[in-house]
């Protein structure tokens, strides 16, 4: 799936996955300089990288340390093996990480990871080092929301956009406006009239240029607009009827800068940084306020808390699933009596503290350990949410609404597509649990053995 096909919420999910991936890769350390990082751009040929790796394999034979030589050659072999699984590169290129790393328990572990990124890979790289290089993954985290800038003063105007860390100057022009006429006499009013007319025409040109550059198909092609300048022109433009109302509606900040042109543009970008980062928070606040409104109006079209939200998900009732991205909850798959006739599998979703208190690692007898698979619950949701027919919105706690959602509602909730009696679902689950408990007790209780 390419970046252009992703919705904003899907991009947020992909960024979340990349952040988790970066954490994992940056915590790994190689055995010597024996871990490999490979970046392949969309235009590259797999055959070219295969040739390079084969050459590097031969070069590695000159490494003096026998252990390091074997580790490097093993990583190269693993990289070649993974590349052979591709007939052609994915549309956005490929990232490949291979090598033997030390785990947190100081144990060796072989790692081979191929990543099809959701944004195009920007550069080619082959590097053998003692750590994985994640610069390209960090670039994937940059916002792809595009903001417009207009730097306007009495000497001219500059138009530009900013997308992530990429600045693009779209257009600029200079102007010579008449100064205030200091002399009196009959010509004073005439010069003032000419001056005002020239200023008006200048602002008209600025406004028309903004519409041409920042409006496409009758709608803004940017998510926000910053007006900057050293004089009053920016405020006059903002308040003018000449300024397109569609652009006026998305002005996120008006800032004073000391210089025109490129220098003023750089100043404007620095001064507007807080407003640009706040656009995502505004969207987040709007989403959560809608959720809170459902609760305040008691529409019964909402759920919150881990267990109730899971019940609604399994019932297919959730339209929009809202989850705090740093939710400290795990999904435990518990297997009892693996391989036996009475093998059973259970799934628990809880915190690590709850798992310890519930003692899910031990069977009821307390003598046999269960087989446990532990997975971050948000990771699991990010992978599986589509199976439940819902959209997934990942939120932070950087806004007041986000903090309230985490503290007051457990950091997870949903907007439902139809009303659901959650209390009735709880009662059904409780009844099923009671029946299972009674059945288990009946199996343990043998009348003939105990009373005959």
UniProtKB/Swiss-Prot annotation:
One of its GO terms (molecular function) is mRNA binding. The lineage of its organism: Eukaryota, Discoba, Euglenozoa, Kinetoplastea, Metakinetoplastina. It comes from the Eukaryota. It is found in: Cytoplasm. Coiled coil: none annotated. This is Eukaryotic peptide chain release factor subunit 1. Directs the termination of nascent peptide synthesis (translation) in response to the termination codons UAA, UAG and UGA. One of its GO terms (cellular component) is cytoplasm. It comes from Trypanosoma brucei brucei.
